[in-house]
Amino acid sequence: MRYDEAANFLLDLRRYGPKPGTESTADLLASLGDPHQDGPDYVQIAGSNGKGSTARFTESILRAAGLDVGLYTSPHFDDVRERVTVNGRRMSKAALTTFIETITPYVTERAADGAAPTYFEVVTAMALWQFSRADVDVAVLEVGIGGRLDATSVVDPSASAVTSVTLEHTDVLGETIPEIARDKAHVAPAGDTPLVTATTDDALAAVRDHAGAVRTVGDTAGRDVTATYEGRTNHTEAAVSITGDDWSVATEIPLLGDHQAENAGVAAALARQTAGVDDDAIARGLRSAHWPGRFEVMGADPVVVLDGAHNPGACGAVAETVAEFDYDRLLTVFGAMHDKDHGAMAAALPTPDHVWACEPVPDRAEDADVLAAVFEDAGAGTVSVTRAVESAVADAIAEATADDLVLVAGSLFAVAEARTRWTRTFAETDVDSLDDARDALERAHVTPPGVWRMRGKGVHRVVKTRVQTRQAQYLKEELLSLGGECSVSGLNAQSGAMVDAVMMATMAQFKRLCEKLDGQPYGLSEVGADLRESLGIQAAPATHGYPWEGERTAVMGILNVTPDSFHDGGEYDALEDAVARAESMAENGVDVIDIGGESTRPGADAVSVADELDRVLPVIERISDLDVLLSVDTRKAEVARQALEAGADILNDVTGLDDPEMRFVAAEYDAPIVVMHSIDAPVDPDSDPDYDDVVDDVIAELTERVLLAEKAGVPRERIIVDPGLGFGKSAAEGFELLDRADEFHALGGPVLVGHSHKSMFGAVDRYPDEGGYATAAASALAADRGADIVRVHDVPENVAAVRVAEATRTGADAE
C-alpha cells in the first residue's frame, strides 16, 4: 500500500458521522492485540476550551524532565500526522501506511456489517498503536468531545484533567453546565489520584460530585494550585507564577492570556502527579511549549495574531488578551463554521475598525456574506468580504500600519489557512535525469501512472510545494496552458486537504505563471507572490554585507576551545594556542571563525554557563580585531548574550533554539543565527529516528524552528539553516542531505553544511586522515549543490575546494 492510498483510506472514513461510545475503538484495538493495555502511563485532558494548550504544556514539561512522550491532539492544520507525535516529531508516513494496511481488512469487514469505525476512532487507535510501538513513557491524550463516551476513554488514565466547561455539543453532552461537567469528569483516574481542574462554580461542583477527589487550579484564594498571570514580557511571551503545597515556579510561557496561566497550572499539576517532575523541568517545559494558532503572535510592526477561537468563550478570552496590547486600529480577519454562534462570537471579540469576512475551505464554513452581516450588526467599522483566507490576511496586513493590530480568528481552519503565509515553502529540486524526475514525483506521492507519464517532462526546473486542493488544480491548469506541467499528489480527493504539488517548467513559464496568478481567487495571488520571491523572479537578491551572499560560498572555521571535542579536543584549549589558530585561519582565507566552548560529541559532559564563558570570552576578546566574522557555538542564551557583547557577530545553536531565550538574544543584537536540525545534542549514538524522506522531513521540522526565530524578530535573511549532518542521521541520510543542500533554501535563508570529519565518510571507505580528504571533497560538492557556508576544521584545503567549485560555476579571472 502506498502512502497516498493509506491516507485517502483514512480520510475517507470521515463519511461516517461521529458516534458516542468507546466500544468501537476497543474492538479495533482488540484486532491489533490491544497495544494500549501494556502501553505507557496515560494522561487524559478534557475541557471545552484550553485542553489542547494544556496537553501541549503537559507534554513539554514531561519531555523537559527527560521522558519519552507521545501527544495526541486534534484537529490538525496541514497533515493528519500532526495529531500523533512522539517527542515532538509527527508520525512518519511509513508508520501510518503500515497501520492502515494492517486494519484495512477489519475496517472493511465492519463496514460491510454497517458498523465501520469512525475517522476519530481510527485516528485514536492509531495514536495508541504508535505510542506502544515507540515505547513512550507517557502518552498525553486530548479528549475529543466530553469524556464519558469519547474514544480516548478506552484507556485507563493515571492522571487526568478538566480544564473548563461551557455550553457545547448540548445534543450529546447535556443542556446545562453541570450536565456537561459531569460528562467530562468521567475522565477521572481510578483510585485516590485527584482529577485536576480549573473549573469554577456549578461546573466545579458537578466535577467534584462525580470525581470525588479533585485538585483545583486558579488565581483565587482557596485553590490547591495557584496560577497567576503576570502579563506580557514581550510581544510573544508572558510571565506566570504557579504555586502548590510545597513547590513554586516562576517562568514565562509562549501562549498569551490569563486563561493560559490556568492551563499552565493544570499542566504542572498533571506532570507532578504523573512523574514527580521538579520545578526546573516545569519552568523549562512551559517556556518551550509552542502551540500554533493559539494566540500566536507572528511578529510586530504590525502585531499579527492568529487564534483559533471558535466559540463565544474563547473569543472572550482573545478579547482580554488583545487588551494587553497598545494599538491604533484593530483589523480582523474572521472565518467560522456554520454551526457556531456567530453573533455571540462577534459580540465577545473587540469591535474591529475593519473586518474581512472570509470562508475557510471546509464545506462547513459559513458564507462570508453572512459573517459580514453579523459584524455589521455588531457595529464594526468597515466590513469587507474577501472569501479566500490567505487573500483576506494579505489585504489586512497591507492596510495595517506599524501601530495597528491584525487579528485572525473564528476557526482553527481559518488560522491554518492564514498560517501558510509564514510556513509555505517552495523546494527547488535539481533534476538532471529521468531518475531524478521520478524520485521528485514519487516523494510527492504522485500515482505510479502519473510518475511514468510525467517523468520525461521534468528534466528542467522543478519546484515542490504544499497547497490547498483547489489551488493545486488551478496551478495544474495554468501551467498546462503555458506549456509547463504540474503533478499533484494522489492524496487529492479530500475537500480542503493540503496536498503536495510538483511544478515543472522553465523560468520563463514560471514567470508567466506568477503573472497569471496575480488577482486570482482562493489565495492564489499570495501563492504567486511567494513563488516569485522564492525563485527570484524579477527581483535582485538583497545584500547585507555577509560573505555568504551572491554566488560565493563562505568558509566557517571551527575553533574548539574544549578538552573533549570529537576531532580537535584539547588542541586549542590554551588561550595562546587558540589565538594562533584563529590567526592562521584568517591568513588562509576563512570568512567566519566559530568558537565553541562545549562539546556535542557522544557522551560529552555538560558544561556550566560560567565554565563555558571562561573558555570562549577571552578568545573572542583577543581575536575580535581580525578581519573575519566571529561566531559563538553555544546552546545557552546567556553565553550567546555575553559573547555578542564581547565582539561576536553570529550565533550558532546546534539544538535549534532549545533554549527559549536564544531567539530573543539574536533579535536584540541583530545577529545572524544558525538554527540546526538535531534530534539530540550531545549526539546520542543510539538514536535512530524514522524519516520518510530525510530532506523533506528535516525541512518540515526546521520550518517551525525558523518561524520561532522570525516571530521573535529575526528576519529570514539572518536565519541560517543547518540540516544537521550526523545529528540523528545515518551515513546514507547524511549524503542525501549533502546532495540536496540547495532544497533548504526553501526556508528563505542561507544554508550551512557542517560535515567536517564526520563519521559518515567511513561509509565510502576513504577515511585515511580521519576524514580530512573526504571533508575537502564534500566541501566542493556542498558549494556546487548550493551551500552558502561550509563549516570545517581544516581551513586551507577547504577554502581551496570551495573556490575551485566557485570558479567552475562562475568562471575564473584570467589575471
Curated annotation (Swiss-Prot):
Domain Pterin-binding: from-to ranges: 553-803
List of residues binding Mg(2+): N560
Pfam families, alphabetized: Mur_ligase_C (PF02875), Mur_ligase_M (PF08245), Pterin_bind (PF00809)
Cysteines joined through disulfide linkages: none
EC code(s) of this entry: 6.3.2.17, 2.5.1.15
Reactions catalysed: (6S)-5,6,7,8-tetrahydrofolyl-(gamma-L-Glu)(n) + L-glutamate + ATP = (6S)-5,6,7,8-tetrahydrofolyl-(gamma-L-Glu)(n+1) + ADP + phosphate + H(+); (7,8-dihydropterin-6-yl)methyl diphosphate + 4-aminobenzoate = 7,8-dihydropteroate + diphosphate
SUPFAM superfamilies listed in its UniProt record: Dihydropteroate synthetase-like, MurD-like peptide ligases, catalytic domain, MurD-like peptide ligases, peptide-binding domain
Family statement drawn from the similarity comment of this UniProt entry: In the N-terminal section; belongs to the folylpolyglutamate synthase family. In the C-terminal section; belongs to the DHPS family.
Name of this chain's protein: Probable bifunctional folylpolyglutamate synthase/dihydropteroate synthase
Lineage: Archaea, Methanobacteriati, Methanobacteriota, Stenosarchaea group, Halobacteria
